[in-house]
């Protein structure tokens, strides 16, 4: 997860103009203190590996089991992680295709078959692989056009094998040229060129698009103009009125702006999975504290668990993944290193989630 300033500007401008050695008991204790035990079934966790002090994958999987996490997302087919997941079919795994592999894979179906045989096939009998994501926020961009052919090849492959694996991609909100009010949501011209064909393929296969939604970045761009309670699900009052639809939190507004943009391109009722959301606990002064991060993530969990959906899609449950399991010290210095729920050294929670 890395946001480039130029792309941040394009999205946030439209947003802010208007919005005034461990044993099992150790793991269980950690689980109870972070609070996921009672609400995890709707929530997944991103499992990043950009750190030199991370616990072993086997310890991480034990942690996930102890806190009832049943969905995880990994960014590439890491063999150590996948081997640790063997036998844990109660955990649905989303596996990413690395961005740097897209060029070679987009060249031919044979290349995709080779990738699948190496990275997925050896684990099919032992691991519940639910999703393969092709690229991580590369649409729109120079390698964006490589996503669709790889998705098509993987879709053909899993269909021919009758495998229950969904093929999708992960996109960020800079695909939106306009996002406020939500009903004005529309894609950029480059997104229409690169993303819309992907969305239409997903409609045909009834597979969701995975989207990153980070109210934190909108808030951080202008904290004096955007209400913190609106950004953190911490008010029930309507802050943004969009025709007949009222919004009490920024997450729903961003989500629905993307829904509106899809509908304007003739893509209706396509499911959306939140591939990432979260709030850093440090790295940007007093707007990134454990208290604020805990508030956002607690309220996000409650929002997802409620099943109430968004104003545009009421009573339609949302699947979501929190970012991230651990603070990762090899990510860029600042907030990027501080999105984790746990410290990697002692595996203790950074804040209580409930």
Swiss-Prot record:
Q: Which Pfam families match?
A: Glyco_hydro_17 (PF00332)
Q: Which InterPro entries match?
A: Glyco_hydro_17, Glyco_hydro_17_plant, Glycoside_hydrolase_SF
State the superkingdom.
Eukaryota
GO MF annotations, alphabetized: glucan endo-1,3-beta-D-glucosidase activity; glucan exo-1,3-beta-glucosidase activity
Enzyme class label: hydrolase
Q: Which reaction does it catalyse?
A: Hydrolysis of (1->3)-beta-D-glucosidic linkages in (1->3)-beta-D-glucans
Q: What is this protein called?
A: Probable glucan endo-1,3-beta-glucosidase BG5
Q: Which residues are glycosylated?
A: 286
Any keyword Secreted?
Answer: yes
Q: Name one GO biological process term.
A: defense response
Described purpose of this protein according to its UniProt entry = May play a role in plant defense against pathogens.
Instruction: State a GO cellular component annotated for this protein.
Output: extracellular region
Main location as per UniProt: secreted
Q: Where does it localize?
A: Secreted
> What PROSITE patterns would the database entry show?
GLYCOSYL_HYDROL_F17 (PS00587)
Instruction: Point out the signal peptide segment.
Output: 1-30
**Catalytic residue list:** 137 (proton donor), 276 (nucleophile)
Q: Which gene encodes it?
A: BG5
Give the family, as the similarity comment puts it: Belongs to the glycosyl hydrolase 17 family.
Which keywords, in A-to-Z order, does the entry hold? Glycoprotein, Glycosidase, Hydrolase, Plant defense, Secreted, Signal
Name the EC number(s): 3.2.1.39
| PANTHER family given in the database record | GLUCAN ENDO-1,3-BETA-GLUCOSIDASE BG1-RELATED-RELATED
